[in-house]
Design a protein with these regions (language model features):
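Structured beta-strand/loop patches that form or line metal/cofactor-binding pockets in enzymes
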Residues: 1-45, 49-54, 330-332
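Active-site mouth loops of central-metabolism enzymes
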Residues: 131-145, 165-166, 194, 198, ...
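Catalytic core of soluble alpha/beta enzymes
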Residues: 163, 169-306, 310, 332-335
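N-terminal small/glycine-rich loop or linker at the start of catalytic domains
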Residues: 115-140, 259
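Metal- or metallocofactor-binding catalytic centers and their adjacent structured scaffolds
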Residues: 5, 37-114
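Flexible C-terminal active-site loop/helix
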Residues: 6, 11-15, 297-364
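Catalytic domains of carbohydrate-active enzymes, especially glycoside hydrolases
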Residues: 153-164
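Active-site beta->alpha loop and helix N-cap motifs at the rims of alpha/beta catalytic domains
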Residues: 113, 117, 136-147, 152, ...
Length: 364
């Protein structure tokens, strides 16, 4: 591989509807897009989603990181070069995970096209084997919008839901009641509080007041409150999903001793790219900790495709997948056709199967 061009641009795609949770309200994507071109004229694309409340990044900081190191990345000519740079600059990537994710993904896409292999084969694996099934994520919209969205999901055959907790007890209870009243066999609901509560007793009281049955609680307390989460898990009898509280492999010693209390939400952009996401998933498997392969709100087909590698490789510890929303949420995707779930949350691999790199067709 000989790279002749490497660029980063910001990406803002309008949403079809505003998405709200306890940490943010979004009407557009907030992402960076990296384009890598080889001397042969092949092009690789990468995406990252900076989130200040998750990793401390912004689009501006991602662009500054890119400008500072672009010349070094231009010299990468192989998978070994990419891995060597990532390993040597691990601390720097810890502070710029979404930016590095975009760069790494573009390079993997380009390498795959140069080698005429899909990215998972470039990484030493086998081609993906679908189908993949996604959860429905319900945000904090007003109840009329929530109810309409819920009806659509249920009619489409979804049984796995993630419900954002907004902190208005009556409104949250109404949402839980609507899910319960659906009477869907095998219905699974997990709550995501986006670090809403400061105290364990406060969280316990609120969750019990919702009068629902939940499979897991995501980020109920302040970021990094592992002791509080342990106590809450034991009290409520369900595991805690760590998202903002788990962003790098070095945090495993904090949770490995009691694997039954935890689930990890592995979002590729948050973890700092596919290689690091797979490293975390492998360590989770060794520790007996299940995973969710998650997504940032507003991801395009690029990050959807990358996350499939983690989900496919670690199916034996995978409890849920999030994302693949495509133009269900976005006014448009970068790819045609977009990678997005269909009936029952299922995504077939026919869109990209057998194609090199990411296997996506870019319309924009």
């Amino acid at each position: 591989l000989r790279m002749c061009s490497l660029t980063m641009t910001s990406l803002e795609i309008p949403f079809r509807q505003v998405f709200t949770h306890a940490s943010a309200t979004r009407a557009t994507t907030e992402a960076v897009l990296v384009r890598a071109e080889s001397a042969r004229g092949l092009v690789g694309m990468g995406e990252g989603c900076p989130r200040q409340y998750v990793t401390g990044e912004t689009v501006a900081s991602a662009q500054e990181f890119f400008r500072s190191h672009r010349a070094e990345w231009m010299t990468c000519s192989s998978m070994d070069d990419l891995q060597t740079w990532g390993t040597a600059h691990a601390d720097l990537i810890d502070r710029n995970p979404a930016a590095w994710c975009a760069v790494e993904t573009a390079c993997l896409d380009l390498l795959g096209k140069e080698l005429e292999q899909p990215i998972e084969v470039v990484l030493g694996g086998t081609p993906l084997s679908g189908p993949f099934r996604y959860s429905a994520v319900l945000g904090g919209e007003k109840f009329s919008s929530f109810e309409k969205q819920l009806r659509q999901y249920l009619a489409a055959g979804f049984i796995d839901f993630k419900l954002k907790v907004m902190g208005d007890l009556e409104a949250d209870r109404e949402r839980v009641a609507a899910l319960t009243a659906a009477g869907t066999p095998g219905l699974r609901v997990r709550l995501d509080a986006n670090n809403r509560w400061h105290r364990v007793d406060e969280a316990c009281e609120y969750i019990q007041s919702l009068q629902g049955s939940f499979t897991a609680l995501e980020e109920p307390l302040r970021v990094g409150d592992y002791e509080g989460c342990r106590a809450l898990s034991r009290h409520c009898g369900v595991p805690i999903i760590l998202d903002e509280s788990f962003v790098k492999v070095g945090q495993f010693p904090l949770i490995e001793g009691e694997p039954s209390l935890w689930i990890l939400n592995i979002r590729v952009s948050k973890m700092g790219g596919l290689l690091r996401a797979c490293t975390v998933a492998a360590r989770a498997k060794a520790a007996g900790i299940p995973i969710v392969v998650g997504a940032q709100v507003g991801e395009t087909s690029i990050l959807t495709r990358v996350a499939l590698v983690v989900a496919d490789r670690y199916r034996d510890i995978l409890i849920a997948q999030e994302g693949a929303v495509g133009t269900h949420l976005l006014e448009y995707d970068l790819c045609e056709p977009p990678l997005m779930f269909g009936r029952g949350g299922c995504l077939a691999d026919t869109v990209f199967y057998g194609r090199s790199g990411l296997g996506l067709s870019f319309a924009r």
